[in-house]
Regions:
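Collagenous Gly-X-Y triple-helix signature in extracellular proteins
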Residues: 2-6, 13-146
């Protein structure tokens, strides 16, 4: 579905039996969180700011989680517009979907500045670092997929 970046452990967060804070878990470690009352599997895909990348600013310094399975299929945009910043999916992820997490988890998810193409398509301009798009949950881009 997308990524969330958590800032350390939060009271009530699901922890492994050893009780390590999420910030100390290795990349590839599984994490289980409740989404809309259902235990859902995530994987830790990064710790800190992605290495060797100037695309991300300090807001992205945290534990990056990827939902292991597709939660649901949603439309990108109901109109014929290719702008992620005003897309239906961006709005859904950072409002409706975000609110499916318990409040303590929602509070632990960091707001980050995500690299994106402002105004989309060939007429847009790449934005990154401090000029990134503010969000808490986002779809993977081609860059993040690798």
């Amino acid at each position: 579905m997308g990524r969330v970046i958590l800032s350390g452990a939060s009271k009530g967060m699901t922890k492994p039996t050893v009780g390590a804070p999420i910030s100390e878990l290795a990349v590839g470690s599984p994490v289980r969180l409740s989404v809309n009352g259902t235990v859902t599997d995530f994987l830790i895909v990064n710790q800190g700011i992605p290495s060797n990348s100037i695309l991300y600013d300090s807001s992205c310094n945290g534990t990056w989680l990827l939902m292991k399975n597709i939660y649901e299929n949603r439309v990108w945009q109901s109109g014929n517009i290719n702008k992620y910043e005003s897309s239906d999916i961006h709005t859904y992820l950072n409002n409706t979907f975000l609110n499916l997490f318990e409040s303590n988890i929602r509070d632990a998810i960091k707001q980050v500045k995500l690299p994106y193409r402002k105004n989309g398509g060939s007429g847009g301009s790449d934005q990154s670092g401090a000029n990134g798009l503010l969000c808490k949950i986002f779809l993977l881009s081609g860059y993040e997929i690798g």
